[in-house]
Amino acid sequence: MKSLFIASTMVLMAFPAFAESTTVKMYEALPTGPGKEVGTVVISEAPGGLHFKVNMEKLTPGYHGFHVHENPSCAPGEKDGKIVPALAAGGHYDPGNTHHHLGPEGDGHMGDLPRLSANADGKVSETVVAPHLKKLAEIKQRSLMVHVGGDNYSDKPEPLGGGGARFACGVIE
């Protein structure tokens, strides 16, 4: 019995805490609403910040802006008389009301994540870390967004890093 207790204790010590995680399905952001699934993002709690394990396809090769957005919706909306894909997701998650896009290491939007790099086949398979986000509960009932273009982590020369249109969106549940 004592051996069983010791063995059980050793197993439990090897896994001191099972970090919370969730999988977000990412869909094309279209003027008519969410389109076909283009991949997944597994978000998990880990030392150093939330980890975002991204597996996506159908992107253009190169860099893409990647952010947590305010609202849990990927529905289109109307802005300046035009339909905008995934507009209902709102802006970048910014609980501190900084109104600044300074990247994942900066003191701006908490939703600024490291940009993604799609290979020549338009696929992304990488894990990025959000050092300012520690708990999954902080971003539940929000959305993830991948933009068409890169992100320079600045509001100049274009606002919000110049990432351009919304390419893919998923709701964090």
Curated annotation (Swiss-Prot):
Transmembrane segments: none
Reaction catalysis annotation: 2 superoxide + 2 H(+) = H2O2 + O2
Residues noted as binding Zn(2+) in the record, renumbered to the chain: 92, 101, 109, 112
Required cofactor names: Cu cation; Zn(2+)
Pfam families given in the database record: Sod_Cu
Similarity remark: Belongs to the Cu-Zn superoxide dismutase family.
Protein name per UniProt: Superoxide dismutase [Cu-Zn]
Organism: Brucella abortus biovar 1 (strain 9-941)
Gene behind this protein: sodC
